[in-house]
């Protein structure tokens, strides 16, 4: 029992457990690659079809494969009472589980132009952006600057802080999910700034990728999440 407490209650936040499936170890499940709601080439010219296919079929799938493997190993370690193995597996679970969580959000954050990609946010989210950042243009400038300045690999997020009841911009390193920055943060938009997200098309010019991704940003999805999480706005 103490070992289970070590894994499920002390080492990882409850929101991360829920997002990554750690709360369901006793009935171990496997995760699979989600289908995209659009064709690989549907985001061109902002993001090439080649990048989308590799990003989805190879990179995201690899995170899922390794995540399922790590969860199976964790389940075995818990059953055996192997505390050293449990501790050793935490980094693999965080990295690969985070990769799965982050990419599952990322695909929903994008939409072809013909399906509303790039259309400006309206309603309560639009008003919140103006209130918390001054304007949409200032928010985009801030997120682009944070994404360009992020050393190595990671993500830049527009989030709702449910405790403060305001929008914030956060960055996370590697595949850390947003919940690692705080359990009250809800991701509205996440931009992948790993090189695999842009290098084939934009080479090492990350700012160009950040500038163009807004042309296919799915603000409708972000607005729906915001309205659900902050219904009084």
UniProtKB/Swiss-Prot annotation:
GO cellular component: mitochondrial matrix
UniProtKB keywords: Manganese, Metal-binding, Mitochondrion, Oxidoreductase, Transit peptide
Main location: mitochondrion
MF GO annotations: manganese ion binding; superoxide dismutase activity
Reactions catalysed according to its record: 2 superoxide + 2 H(+) = H2O2 + O2
EC code(s) of this entry: 1.15.1.1
Disulfide bonds: none
Cofactor: Mn(2+)
InterPro entries hit by this protein: Fe/Mn_Superoxide_Dismutase, Mn/Fe_SOD, Mn/Fe_SOD_BS, Mn/Fe_SOD_C, Mn/Fe_SOD_N, Mn/Fe_SOD_N_sf, SOD_C_sf
Enzyme class: oxidoreductase
Subcellular localization(s) per the UniProt record: Mitochondrion matrix
Claim: Repressor is one of the keywords in the record: no
Cofactor note: Binds 1 Mn(2+) ion per subunit.
Tissues in which the UniProt entry reports expression: Present in all tissues examined (leaf, petiole, root, latex, callus) with young leaves showing the highest levels in intact plants.
Keyword Amino-acid biosynthesis included in the entry's annotation: no
Stretch forming the transit peptide: 1-27
Positions with a binding annotation for Mn(2+): 55, 103, 192, 196
Quaternary structure and interacting proteins, as annotated: Homotetramer.
Family: Belongs to the iron/manganese superoxide dismutase family.
Function per UniProt: Destroys superoxide anion radicals which are normally produced within the cells and which are toxic to biological systems.
Protein name: Superoxide dismutase [Mn], mitochondrial
Organism: Hevea brasiliensis (Para rubber tree)
